[in-house]
């Protein structure tokens, strides 16, 4: 089993880190509106909820079939038509989200945009259209969010749960109890991908279903050591294919809210009898699901067969509910999963914890002297970067800042989206060395401020003991930073003063300036 934070291997199983769900001391007021946007491979969804007494009540739900997953070519580039469908949908969502606070909206992109080589083109314009950042999450992080969404809408019990989510291009499996995901995996197969591969012409034949199920079983085979039948008590299915199948079965008179092997056999027989997707006549089958029902059913049948499932309950929660509750957890550092993930990374890569905490304290002190209002989240990210700035030493001390950036850019870290990890990686990469050699966005004042505070903290903590910060003040005047000390400080700490003067010279090669007034 893989650890929760591991070099990226989206198709592998790994154990999610322990994160106790303590009572959330949130600054959020009752009545606050929150929103989650799920950019799936088949559909884009918008969920709006109202925060009331620690829970989120649904206010509005919008869904549009975009089928972006079908727009990937053989080189894994999204077609312009597929991107345009996505942008048009985001424009409609943006109108509904007008006026929402930035920290109250979470937009999450999944497998199609994980795969797309030209995803940056879509994301850059999508960010501008939506008005909120789109986070491309890893497969394991998608699985964690799915479990959060499912578990939040289930009665609390000590039952061991298996949660399955079959999306357009990926399938997530999760083992967990209560709110804690204990093992997750994400497999690159789904309703859109399997329909394109095995039912491209829309024909339903026994041979096509056999080939599709065999391929799905081969993908699932590597998960059996973790997701074995004795590892869970109750199986739940969420969203997408499972929700659609559950609705079809209920309309046909099968027990509502449940899927059995016998019911799947019945549905397969119906599709084979129809012979083609266009001829399927089933109550509950929506038109947007018709082109992908064959691929979705073949994956679901393989899951039942290989994991030994006899009965699966259809869950109400899904990724978007998980994203909403994740917004709540981020309101307070103590409940932010990313904080415990950083601690796990520090332990795994044998970071010198006292020194990392020292640098984080000094960087935080400097940042607090110059940061504007509502900079708490930026301060938290600076704290994480400072705690991880020596993570690359586990590989080699020479060039450790580059090694650290590589680790963060290629890690599945619970709670983090890939852009967030890249942001931390940039800070770690740039915390030492010549600034002129780096390709950084100097127009991003928040990032530049974080970087300046981190580099100054590293210099002040060079002796790996607590520096004398009495009288040390950092100010910002436009594109100029001014660092002051009390009279006599430079004479007491000549090496620190020397390092700060070198740092000041390095900033001359950037659009920013670091001035020193050392007494």
What are these regions (language model features)?
Residues 29-34, 48-51, 67, 71-102, ...:
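Helical "lid/coupling" subdomains associated with nucleotide-phosphate turnover
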Residues 43-45:
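Short N-terminal binding/cap micro-motifs at the start of the first secondary-structure element
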Residues 54-59, 180-182:
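Beta-strand initiation motifs
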Residues 160-174:
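A generic, well-ordered mixed alpha/beta core segment in the N-terminal half of proteins
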Residues 310, 510-519:
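A short amphipathic beta-strand at an alpha->beta junction
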Residues 492-514:
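Short, non-transmembrane amphipathic alpha-helical segments
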